[in-house]
């Protein structure tokens, strides 16, 4: 069964870009000290953020690609480890994602059901793209979408949710956070026009997810 791992990075719009009613909505239940958190949270929602990178890796071959925004800087295609890095705009990021996904029977994410998948689908609708495949199939089956956050927590049976970093540390897998970057820093990196750093970080997230998938496949898949 051909399988692909993918991960996305997102960046929210500036709070000042929202219209008055939208700003009021986000601030409605916020105390003064929480307002900065409200600004930062815009990256989490497909209505107020854009996809700035999607990384994909073929599980069988280990080859990968990252499609990432460079805001028209003309960086050109480059290579990072086993990943081909392709600069483009958000529309082409999404088009390339759907094009590549056609070649796979199953896909692997970490927390993709709660974040990556609905984000990709909504942003695709924004651009008028046809949703070629339901990225949110029946949750309690791992035949098509293997969301490792679901699988490793036994569908939420653990007392709390744990991030990819903690799962990697527990299983002895190199975490992309060890390079000093996390998803929370992507917004600032994008403002600083460090587009290649975002692309490389995205590829590292994909590699970590793939290695975590390998552990799940070896030890737990048959019991899931």
Feature map (PLM): residue ranges:
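Conserved RNase H-like, two-metal-ion catalytic cores of nucleic-acid enzymes
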Residues: 1-92, 99
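Metal-dependent phosphoesterase core characteristic of DEDDh/y 3'-5' exonuclease domains
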Residues: 2, 49-52, 57-62, 67-83, ...
């Amino acid at each position: 069964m051909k399988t692909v791992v993918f991960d996305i990075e997102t960046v929210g719009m500036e709070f000042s870009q929202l219209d008055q009613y939208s700003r009021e909505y986000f601030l409605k239940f916020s105390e003064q000290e929480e307002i900065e958190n409200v600004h930062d949270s815009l990256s989490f929602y497909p209505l107020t953020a854009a996809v700035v990178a999607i990384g994909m890796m073929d599980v069988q071959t280990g080859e990968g690609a990252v499609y990432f925004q460079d805001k028209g800087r003309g960086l050109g295609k480059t290579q990072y480890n086993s990943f081909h890095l392709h600069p483009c705009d958000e529309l082409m990021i999404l088009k390339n994602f759907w094009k590549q996904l056609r070649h796979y029977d199953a896909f692997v994410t970490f927390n993709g059901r709660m974040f990556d998948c609905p984000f990709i689908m909504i942003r695709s609708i924004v651009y008028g793209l046809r949703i070629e495949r339901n990225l949110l199939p029946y949750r309690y089956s791992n035949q098509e979408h293997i969301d490792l956050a679901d699988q490793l927590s036994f569908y939420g049976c653990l007392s709390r949710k744990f991030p990819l970093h903690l799962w990697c540390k527990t299983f002895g897998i190199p975490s992309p956070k060890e390079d000093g970057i996390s998803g929370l820093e992507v917004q600032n990196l994008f403002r600083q026009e460090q587009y290649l750093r975002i692309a490389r970080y995205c590829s590292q997230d994909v590699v970590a997810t793939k290695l975590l998938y390998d552990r799940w496949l070896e030890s737990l898949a048959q019991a899931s």
